[in-house]
A protein has these predicted regions:
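C-terminal His-loop and adjacent cap/lid subdomain of alpha/beta-hydrolase
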Residues: 24-508
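Positively charged n-region of N-terminal signal peptides that target proteins for export
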Residues: 1-4
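Sec/Tat signal peptide C-region and signal peptidase I cleavage site
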Residues: 18-24
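Bacterial N-terminal signal peptides
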Residues: 6-17
């Protein structure tokens, strides 16, 4: 009966099927994971890439959760370029295998996803994808999974132990965080991020990533009857931070990693709780100035490390929290600056009395002063537990764009590179700056039309291939370099007169 059903499924368009349980294989995997995971689903897929619509579940498809808590398709699209610049999928092949999902036994919201290629296609290696923000385990479906599944890797990802967010009422929810600055059209909207719930922490991200790796290795052994020969990490933003930490504190588990625009944390700075409040304190003044580049507010934001503001061509009225997308700073302020500050203040400094309802309370996100609170409120030990000191013990390639307007490159990518050099680990690290690259790929395209921006994904994917050659063939990757607009990583940056760091954050 199983073979008959599969024969029928073979002629059904892949957009319709994630298929059916593969009884024998799934039974072995279920047995191997007994007592470790819960809510396990194991299905045979005709194609593990996103060409199969069933690969990434619909948004809000987990019963019992509020809207926005679980949004796999939104998560995958948020960090990926739009077509036609998405990861290319070979039209001449399909990529069958098992798709397995579940949660850790101690927390039903600590979710993971595992994709196991058909045995004939598996290359005996595993990639661990770590999402950015607080997004789901499906966030890397376009940017990570589609790349590595086609190469025969098994792929596992985790939501780092927590769901995303839901909209809430500020007065009734003590953990509410305003979505956008007060002057924005969405300044009255409030969110509740699961990261701020009791028991959740940044440290949990590291533990849950290691647990997802454990799950994958157990399932791989049960399915293929052998352990993976190599295990690699790939992470973006908060996920890049996790990659950096794990290559320092758990290096025996991994062979190397790709860090795409990871967050830098240091007890004495820089860190996002120093940068973001400065931008927020000056935001109203910048708006009042008519978004003038020469206003004192603009100069103060630039002095905090942020790249220059740019304008969309043409402005777009949709697909954003901004009523009109005309300014890159405005788009980041309304989507990220305010809410990110609030969430991380609650994570790192829970004694800070966040008050976003009373303009006179002087305890809003823009009022936060990390350096003034660091010693009195003992923040150094808390930040030290998640800091990225550069003491990596496995090969790592970092890629970041110079126009990153959420994590300014001068305080994140460059600061981490400096930390690696100071730690004496430069031989294990390569650092590639993408001229005009931004934190959000889609902002270059029809979402927002910031045509001055460059995509980072092609360089991140190239960096992963360089990492594989470095680890498996001993081929040293090209030296750290600035990748110019329209360019690529070159083997001899000195001969090409390329510095390690781009001379300007913006090249028009």
């Amino acid at each position: 009966m199983r073979s008959l059903v599969l024969a029928v499924l073979a002629v059904v368009p892949s957009t319709l099927v994630l298929s059916m349980p593969a009884a024998a294989d799934c039974a072995a995997i279920t047995k191997a994971l007994t007592g470790i995971v819960t809510d396990l689903t194991c299905l045979e897929s005709t194609d593990l890439t996103t060409r199969n619509d069933a690969t990434t579940p619909p948004d809000n498809s987990r019963p019992g959760l509020p809207p926005n808590a679980f949004t796999p398709r939104t998560d995958a699209q948020a960090v990926s370029p739009d077509a036609p610049f998405r990861t290319a999928i070979d039209p001449s092949r399909t990529f069958p295998g098992l798709q397995i999902t579940g949660a850790m036994a101690d927390d039903a919201n600590a979710r993971w996803l595992l994709r196991l290629p058909a045995a004939a296609n598996w290359n005996h290696k595993l990639v661990v994808g770590v999402p950015g923000g607080f997004r789901s385990e499906f966030m890397g479906d376009f940017i990570f999974s589609d790349l590595v599944v086609q190469q025969g890797f098994a792929y596992v990802s985790t939501n780092k132990g927590m769901l995303n967010f839901f909209f809430t009422a500020a007065g009734a929810d003590p953990l509410a965080c305003r979505l956008s600055p007060r002057v924005a059209a969405t300044g009255a909207a409030f969110t509740h991020f699961y990261a701020n719930d009791a028991g959740n922490s940044i440290r949990e991200w590291f533990r849950r990533t290691l647990e997802a790796t454990d799950v994958a290795e157990l399932a791989i052994d049960a399915h293929y009857d052998r352990a993976p020969e190599r295990v690699y990490l790939m992470g973006i933003s908060n996920g890049g931070h996790v990659v950096r930490r794990l290559l320092a504190e758990a290096p025996t588990r991994f062979d190397g990693g790709l860090d795409w625009e990871g967050v830098f944390w240091s007890t004495g700075g820089p860190n996002i709780l120093i940068d973001l409040p400065v931008a927020l304190r000056n935001w109203d003044g910048y708006v009042t100035s008519g978004l003038s580049a020469t206003s004192p507010a603009s100069l103060a934001i630039r002095a905090a490390g942020y790249p220059p503001d740019i304008r969309a061509t043409p402005p777009t009225p949709a697909n954003t929290f901004s009523p009109l997308v005309g300014s890159l700073w405005e788009t980041h302020a309304n989507n990220y600056w305010d809410v990110t500050t609030c969430v991380f203040v609650r994570l790192v400094d829970p004694l800070y009395p966040v008050d976003q309802l009373d303009p006179l309370a002087a305890s809003d996100t823009k009022d936060y002063d990390y350096l003034a609170r660091r010693k009195p409120f003992h923040l150094s030990p808390r930040v030290g537990q998640v800091a990225t000191d550069g003491d990596i013990a496995r090969r790592l390639i970092t890629v970041q764009g110079t126009m990153d307007t959420l994590l300014p490159i001068v305080h994140h990518g460059r600061a981490f590179r400096d930390a690696v050099v100071t730690a004496g680990r430069a031989s294990l690290h390569r650092y590639y700056e993408v001229q005009n690259g931004n934190h959000i790929e889609r902002y270059r395209q029809t979402c927002c039309n910031f045509v001055q921006l460059e995509l980072i994904q092609p360089h991140a994917h190239r960096a992963f291939q360089l990492l594989l050659d470095w680890v498996e063939r001993g081929v040293s990757p090209p030296a750290s370099q600035c990748i110019p607009r329209g360019g690529a990583i070159v083997s001899d940056p000195a001969a090409a007169a390329r510095p390690e760091r781009c001379a300007s954050l913006l090249v028009e």
